[in-house]
Amino acid sequence: MKNIFLHSLTLENYRNFKNLELKTDNTPIILTGENGSGKTNILEAISLFYPGRGLRSSKLTDICKTSEDYCKVKTLLQSKLGLAELSTHIKRSSNRRITEYNASKIANNELSKFTNMVWLTPQMEGIFTSSSTDRRKFLDRIVYNFDTKHAALLNKYEYYMHERNKILAEDIRDNNWLKIIEEKMADISNNIANNRLKTIRFIQQAIDDIENEFPKADLSIDGIIEQKILNVEGDIVNFIITELYKTRSKDKLLGRTSFGIHKSDFLVKHQKKNILAKFCSTGEQKAILIAIILAEINSTIKLTKITPILLLDEIFVHLDDKRRQYLMGFFNALNIQLWVTATDLDGIENFANKAQLIKL
């Protein structure tokens, strides 16, 4: 088993922190303090060492401390590749972010080579009633833990889709280049769709195998390409190429690509009630989301033999005692680094006894 964890975390001009340095090890870490003390800001800073825009999906200009033009986050990480120094620098005036590994620049999508990460925030509790884009991004973040190339595939797909839209919008008469772009999109789409389906199988198996205090969920993906793969309907890549060709005129008028894996939706059902999670109560939705996160943790550890870093923002809030006790036992048994925020330790004293406490 390979344990991934932060040895240290340094923030400079990050949100409400002028300077902050934390020393940590492979144990649970509880961040306590009043609302506004910066607990979630620390989780967000850690999440920047994973592909994407962090757990808040914030604009770069919002991250730097007010009145400062730059900010920096640095960590010494026990990573998949061994001991690694990672840093990310954000400059407000140029709206740029640079990520470095041992002082050499790397692409944001390369971060999955170093870490596995899972997070849960209160904002995610509305994911079942929000847009399909949010659910798709949630699924893709799960996929990153199983396939280190998935983030790069998504970036390439976005790039080629943008190029296709540009060619159609500007009425560039270059059918050969358009054909090449659509062929690349089709090949990448096939890989992305298969990665998503494979990951859903992993998580579903983990859900079915676990007996806990949370409702079981049925996971699926609603997308034309994924459905054809599941039905084993011929040459998927050629099918995508054909559909992209057929929708050129329509997409030229729309100014966007109307067909593709960027239209798929991640669907979640309450298994016992056989209804979509979006129709469940808010309490049930939070419980279902936690069930998926627990399955993701178990599946990631079991299949990759690599432990993820967990970022859990106010996870114990509004849970009944039985579920809170179950989670504390689950986390204590993991032997991994997890970061938990809480305004106080009421109700989680047993968990706190085995954790590193950081009061802000």
Curated annotation (Swiss-Prot):
Name of this chain's protein: DNA replication and repair protein RecF
Keyword Chaperone recorded: no
Statement: the UniProt record of this protein carries the keyword Aminoacyl-tRNA synthetase: no
Keywords per UniProt: ATP-binding, Cytoplasm, DNA damage, DNA repair, DNA replication, DNA-binding, Nucleotide-binding, SOS response
Role played: The RecF protein is involved in DNA metabolism; it is required for DNA replication and normal SOS inducibility. RecF binds preferentially to single-stranded, linear DNA. It also seems to bind ATP.
GO cellular component: cytoplasm
Taxonomic superkingdom: Bacteria
Gene Ontology molecular function: ATP binding; single-stranded DNA binding
A biological process from GO: DNA replication
Family listed: Belongs to the RecF family.
Binding site for ATP: 33-40
PANTHER family for this protein: DNA REPLICATION AND REPAIR PROTEIN RECF
NCBIfam families: recf
Localization per Swiss-Prot or TrEMBL: Cytoplasm
